Amino acid sequence: MAKIYRDVDASLEPLKGKTIAVIGYGIQGRAQALNLRDSGLNVILGLRRGGKSWDQAVAEGFRVFEIGQAVAKADVVMVLIPDMEQPKVWEEQIEPNLKPGTVVDFAHGFNIHFGLIKPPPNVDVVMVAPKGPGRAVREEYLSGRGVPALVAVYQNYSGRAMEYALAIAKGIGATRAGVIETTFAEETETDLIGEQTVLVGGLMELIKKGFETLVELGYQPEVAYFEVLNEAKLIMDLIWQRGIYGMLNGVSDTAKYGGLTVGPKIIDESVKQRMREAAARVRSGEFAKEWVTEYNRGGPTLRKLMEEVKNHQIEKVGIEMRRLLFGQ
């Protein structure tokens, strides 16, 4: 059974009187920095001088330093720049300026788990991974609520690493909703497997194949778009709010019966085998190696695949439908 921490299980005390350097001021970095500051903690920012976020951070009242300077001043360093930028920034600006006993926090375990970042032994290494976008992290905090998070300890130099991790989670509002204890390996692998097989890869391809099938059968593309893409949000909202069983109780009996009898024929047991194969590539590190190579080559395969999606008929129809629906 998962161990879940609530607000009463965490304290901000371990962070009181300490300097927290948030590295990065993108959507997630900005949200976490603002929340920590609003929780009464001392937050500075480490950014690239001249970067587009520098002036914004200054305007919003933060003390801003170049990354190496911020790390040197910090007791806690939160690495909130994109995954693929982290190894170079770590090697050149973060690690050379770390003090012994510093707490280093990541929002995703990718670089630590796959060995792209190797921290020195004299620092704590923790992870606080909000399970929601930065905008939600900020908005929920301001509403007196929070976005759930995962928390993990990779390296416990001080003997208090989990206390620090929970303090960070409390500071950004996550313990209000609940924080689940995990490991860097579990967070990284489940995140990648879930993205590839369901949330991004699987769902996207299911929608595209459904659209293609309806159009090939002679139905109007606009009607096909509504049936397989637009209405997907309505069903996912029901699942998110009520669970799968609750969703079924929120649709018609015809939809229930058709879905329960035909769905398993479309997504059958053979799909699980292919999911296991994708999972094996993630767990072995094969996917990480492939992606790092692709990124270092400038992303030619990614650009090609993105262009194919952009030019798919469902996207062309979608532009018109979203203009009709939302005035975009």
Curated annotation (Swiss-Prot):
InterPro entries: 6-PGluconate_DH-like_C_sf, KARI, KARI_C, KARI_N, KARI_prok, NAD(P)-bd_dom_sf. Coiled coil: none annotated. Residues 183-328 form the KARI C-terminal knotted domain. PROSITE patterns: KARI_C, KARI_N. One of its GO terms (biological process) is L-valine biosynthetic process. Its cofactor is Mg(2+). Substrate binds at residue 252. Residues 2-182 form the KARI N-terminal Rossmann domain. Pathway: Amino-acid biosynthesis; L-isoleucine biosynthesis; L-isoleucine from 2-oxobutanoate: step 2/4; Amino-acid biosynthesis; L-valine biosynthesis; L-valine from pyruvate: step 2/4. The active site is at residue 108. Keywords: Amino-acid biosynthesis, Branched-chain amino acid biosynthesis, Magnesium, Metal-binding, NADP, Oxidoreductase. One of its GO terms (molecular function) is magnesium ion binding. Mg(2+) 1 binds at residues 191, 195. It comes from the Archaea. Belongs to the ketol-acid reductoisomerase family. Involved in the biosynthesis of branched-chain amino acids (BCAA). Catalyzes an alkyl-migration followed by a ketol-acid reduction of (S)-2-acetolactate (S2AL) to yield (R)-2,3-dihydroxy-isovalerate. In the isomerase reaction, S2AL is rearranged via a Mg-dependent methyl migration to produce 3-hydroxy-3-methyl-2-ketobutyrate (HMKB). In the reductase reaction, this 2-ketoacid undergoes a metal-dependent reduction by NADPH to yield (R)-2,3-dihydroxy-isovalerate. This is Ketol-acid reductoisomerase (NADP(+)). It comes from Pyrobaculum arsenaticum (strain DSM 13514 / JCM 11321 / PZ6). The lineage of its organism: Archaea, Thermoproteota, Thermoprotei, Thermoproteales, Thermoproteaceae. The gene is ilvC.
